[in-house]
A protein has these predicted regions:
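Helical scaffold of the NTase/Pol beta-like nucleotidyltransferase catalytic core
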Residues: 2-6, 17-108
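Active-site nucleotide-donor binding segment shared across nucleotidyl transfer reactions
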Residues: 91-142
C-alpha cells in the first residue's frame, strides 16, 4: 500500500482536479502524515507548484506547517518568475526571427506551459526549445 504522503501527492497532482479528486484530497490531508516528507516528495517529483496551488485552492494549506507552506510557496513563485523571464526572452527572440521571415516551431516546455498548465508557477522551465529547418539555421545563428 502507498504511503499517505504519496496518496496526497497523487490526489493533488491534477492540473484541474474535479470534485471527486478534491474530496479525496480533503479526506487525505485531514489525516496524520509527515509534512516534511510530503513537501520533499513534491519537490523531488517536480509537482511542488501543483501541490501548492491545489492545497491553496481548497483552502487547506493550513494543514501544513509554516516552513512547509513557505517552501511550497517559494517553489511556486520561483517557477513563475523564471517562466515569465523565459516567456519574455522568447517573445524578443521570436520578434527578431519573425523580421527575418524564418519559421520556427516551439517544442516541449513552453507549449505545455501555455496550453496545458495555463499557470506559470506550476512547472519550472529551464530553457527554450526551438526547431528550425536546416536551411534557416544560418539565419537564426546570425540573429
Amino acid at each position: 500500500m502507498s504511503s499517505i504522503e504519496y496518496q496526497i501527492l497523487l490526489a493533488a497532482s491534477d492540473i484541474e482536479p474535479g470534485m471527486e479528486q478534491q474530496q479525496k484530497l480533503l479526506g487525505l490531508i485531514s489525516q496524520e502524515f509527515d509534512q516534511g516528507r510530503l513537501v520533499e516528495m513534491a519537490v523531488r517529483e517536480g509537482v511542488a507548484g501543483l501541490l501548492y496551488k491545489n492545497l491553496k485552492k481548497l483552502g487547506v494549506l493550513g494543514y501544513l506547517g509554516h516552513r512547509q507552506i513557505e517552501k511550497l510557496q517559494s517553489f511556486y513563485y520561483s517557477a513563475a518568475r523564471l517562466n515569465l523571464k523565459l516567456l519574455h526572452d522568447l517573445k524578443e527572440i521570436l520578434q527578431i526571427i519573425d523580421q527575418s521571415k524564418i519559421r520556427v516551431v516551439l517544442l516541449q516546455g513552453i507549449p505545455l506551459l501555455q496550453q496545458i498548465y495555463k499557470d506559470v508557477g506550476l512547472r519550472p522551465l529551464t530553457d527554450i526549445d526551438l526547431w528550425v529547418l536546416p536551411e534557416y539555421l544560418p539565419g537564426v545563428e546570425r540573429t
